[in-house]
Amino acid sequence: TLYESWMIRIERLSNGTVVNTTPEMQAFVSKVNNDKGHEFTINIKKLYENLSLGYLYVDSEVEIMPGKPLNSAKQLGDIDVLLINKNTKQIVCIEAKNFSESRTVYELIQQNRKIVTKELSHVIERDVWCKGNIDKFKFYVPEIDEQYSVKTIFLTYHENAYKYFEHERENDIIFLSTIEIVDNPMNVFV
């Protein structure tokens, strides 16, 4: 029906999954996706802030680039949510992605392809940099020493497709969905 067609269109617009063939529509979809991503990141940060744990440092959108506290030789993007646990001596860098839920096998394959070809290489590069530059995190938590470790979590709102496929390239990135941290936010430190 016309109503159902309209509702599908609205859903695709709000999810940022509508087919975009014009520059204006591409810009609109990009803005929708950026807004969704920012809101998701802020909500993950709030989840950890609301725990009110004195030993847990929480920050978001922490840039890794020349001239910033996490000073790197080149622009490496940002850590969406940075958690530093003083008790377990862990630095957890969360890459938060609010992908639309995959409903078909084709969408699962497409999501996996997007993660592998567009997202993961940047996350791995950032993870390697963070592991090699633990001392730079002292800007945020001065107590950081050589006993601290770093891990990166690729967090998606819905369960993501990546873990259901075999991949040629091994990496240290941990893949979680929000359901796994809402039940137990400290899951990221296990």
How should these model regions be labeled?
Residues 1-190:
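Intrinsically disordered, low-complexity Ser/Thr/Pro/Gly-rich regulatory segments
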